[in-house]
C-alpha cells in the first residue's frame, strides 16, 4: 500500500470512528432490561450515560435525565470521562491530519513537517480509540457484575413460590457501536503512524574519511626527486653574476648542464 493511500484510508477510518464514538455516547441504550423470565412485559426500561428511559407497550416513551453528578456511581462517571476524552482527542487528531495529508499542499510545508503531523495525529487516534474501547469495556464489566448479582438475589424461594425482587439489565446497542467505533479509530491511528514512515525524507549517510598528512615532504630538485624532512632549514646562498651580488631565497642552486647527465 502506497503512502498516500495508507494515509487516506487511516484518515477515513478515523472519521468513521469519531462519528461512531459520538453516536454511542449520545445513545440511551447502553443497558437494556433483560426480558428473559420477566413477567412484566408492558414496560421496557433502558439506560444510557445521561438519562434513563421507560417505554410503554403503547409506544409512549418517557426519558428522565440524571439530575445529579455526585450521586452517580463512580464507574459511570469514569465511562463518561473516557468517552469525552476519546472524542476530544479524535477531533484534534482530525484537524491535524487534514493539514498533514500528502495530497493537500499548504504553502511551503515540506514532507518532514507533514510526517511529524501525521505521526502526531496517529498517536492521538490510537489514544482516542483506546479510551473509547476502555470506556465501553468498563461499562460492560459493570453490567456483567450487576447481572450476576441480580441473578443470585432475583428469586427467593418461599414455600415453593418464586418471586421477582429486582430487574436485570444486559448489553445495549450502544456498547457494540462503541466497540466498533473504538476499533476503527485505533486502526486509523495505526495506519497514520505507518504512513509517517513513507513521508519522512530519507537521510543519506556519508562515510567520513580522515586525511592524514604525509610524514615526509617531497621537494623537487633539478637533479631529480629527493625526500627531505619538513624540519630542515633553508639556507640562503649567494651567487655572483656579472660581477654583481644577488641573494636567492630558495635553498637550491641553479641547474648546470652536468646535472642532467
From Swiss-Prot:
Disordered as annotated region, ranges: 228-261
Main location per the UniProt record: other
Residues with Phosphoserine modification: 214
Membrane topology, Cytoplasmic segments: 1-6, 102-122, 196-261
GO biological process, any: bicellular tight junction assembly
InterPro entries found in the cross-reference section: Claudin, Claudin18, Claudin_CS, PMP22/EMP/MP20/Claudin
GO CC aspect terms: bicellular tight junction; cell-cell junction; plasma membrane
Keywords of the record: Cell junction, Cell membrane, Membrane, Phosphoprotein, Tight junction, Transmembrane, Transmembrane helix
Entries under Pfam families matching the protein: PMP22_Claudin
Extracellular side: 28-80, 144-174
UniProt key word Phosphoprotein: yes
Lineage top rank: taxon: Eukaryota
Biased composition (Basic and acidic residues): 239-249
MF terms in GO: structural molecule activity
Transmembrane segments: 7-27, 81-101, 123-143, 175-195
Cellular location(s): Cell junction, Tight junction; Cell membrane
Entry membrane topology: Multi-pass membrane protein
Functional description taken from the UniProt entry: Involved in alveolar fluid homeostasis via regulation of alveolar epithelial tight junction composition and therefore ion transport and solute permeability, potentially via downstream regulation of the actin cytoskeleton organization and beta-2-adrenergic signaling. Required for lung alveolarization and maintenance of the paracellular alveolar epithelial barrier. Acts to maintain epithelial progenitor cell proliferation and organ size, via regulation of YAP1 localization away from the nucleus and thereby restriction of YAP1 target gene transcription.
Similarity section: Belongs to the claudin family.
Description of how the protein assembles with itself and partners: Interacts with TJP2/ZO-2. Interacts with TJP1/ZO-1. Interacts with YAP1 (phosphorylated); the interaction sequesters YAP1 away from the nucleus and thereby restricts transcription of YAP1 target genes. Interacts with CLDN19.
Name recorded for this polypeptide: Claudin-18
Amino acid at each position: 500500500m502506497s503512502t498516500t493511500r495508507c494515509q487516506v484510508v487511516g484518515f477515513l477510518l478515523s472519521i468513521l470512528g469519531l462519528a461512531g464514538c459520538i453516536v454511542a455516547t449520545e445513545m440511551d441504550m447502553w443497558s437494556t432490561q433483560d426480558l428473559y423470565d420477566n413477567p412484566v412485559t408492558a414496560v421496557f426500561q433502558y439506560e444510557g450515560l445521561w438519562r434513563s428511559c421507560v417505554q410503554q407497550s403503547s409506544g409512549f416513551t418517557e426519558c428522565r435525565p440524571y439530575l445529579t453528578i455526585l450521586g452517580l456511581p463512580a464507574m459511570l462517571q469514569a465511562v463518561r470521562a473516557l468517552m469525552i476524552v476519546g472524542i476530544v482527542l479524535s477531533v484534534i487528531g482530525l484537524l491535524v491530519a487534514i493539514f498533514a495529508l500528502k495530497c493537500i499542499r499548504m504553502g511551503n510545508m515540506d514532507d518532514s513537517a507533514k510526517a511529524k503531523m501525521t505521526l502526531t495525529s496517529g498517536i492521538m487516534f490510537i489514544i482516542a480509540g483506546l479510551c473509547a474501547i476502555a470506556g465501553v469495556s468498563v461499562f460492560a464489566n459493570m453490567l456483567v457484575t450487576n447481572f450476576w448479582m441480580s441473578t443470585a438475589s432475583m428469586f427467593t424461594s418461599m414455600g415453593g413460590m418464586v418471586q421477582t425482587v429486582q430487574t436485570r439489565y444486559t448489553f445495549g446497542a450502544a456498547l457494540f457501536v462503541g466497540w466498533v467505533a473504538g476499533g476503527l479509530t485505533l486502526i486509523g491511528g495505526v495506519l497514520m503512524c505507518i504512513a509517517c514512515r513513507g513521508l519522512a525524507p530519507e537521510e543519506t549517510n556519508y562515510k567520513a574519511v580522515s586525511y592524514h598528512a604525509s610524514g615526509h615532504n617531497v621537494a623537487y630538485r633539478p637533479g631529480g626527486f629527493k625526500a627531505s624532512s619538513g624540519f630542515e632549514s633553508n639556507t640562503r646562498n649567494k651567487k655572483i653574476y656579472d660581477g654583481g651580488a644577488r641573494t636567492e631565497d630558495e635553498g637550491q642552486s641553479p641547474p648546470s648542464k652536468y646535472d642532467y647527465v
